[in-house]
């Protein structure tokens, strides 16, 4: 009888997280968050048109620290997802597929996302 307590290969416990896997997961995660935020943005637009009380509640919420934090991260996710999508388009054309280029462009995408987000918020 075989040992049933052994880890199944490949298993997450034996892998060391790499920037390529983390950026891939982050790209999918930001896509899900952005898709979900479209629904919330639609509710916000309808509230502006039809319900004065809900409009005032939403405006006061997005003026608060928590609302601004949500907007900060949604904009950060959008910038990251957009830039990483451009990176994927270059990969589809066959550019930047060497592992060193993948790592360099990954760090560039992270850096540009943070820089552009802070630029949007503070300038």
Predicted regions mapped to residue ranges:
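Membrane-embedded alpha-helical bundles that constitute the cytochrome b-like, heme-associated redox core
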Residues: 1-123
């Amino acid at each position: 009888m075989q040992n049933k307590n052994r880890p199944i290969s490949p298993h997450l416990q034996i892998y060391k997280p790499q920037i390529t896997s983390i950026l891939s997961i982050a790209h999918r995660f930001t896509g899900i968050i952005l898709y979900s935020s479209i629904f919330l943005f639609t509710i916000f637009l309808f509230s502006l048109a039809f319900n004065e009380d809900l409009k005032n509640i939403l405006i006061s919420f997005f003026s608060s620290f928590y609302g601004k934090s949500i907007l900060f991260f949604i904009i950060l996710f959008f910038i990251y997802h957009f830039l990483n999508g451009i990176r994927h388009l270059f990969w589809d054309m066959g550019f930047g597929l060497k592992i060193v280029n993948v790592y360099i462009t990954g760090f560039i995408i992270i850096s540009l996302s943070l820089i552009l987000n802070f630029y949007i918020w503070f300038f």
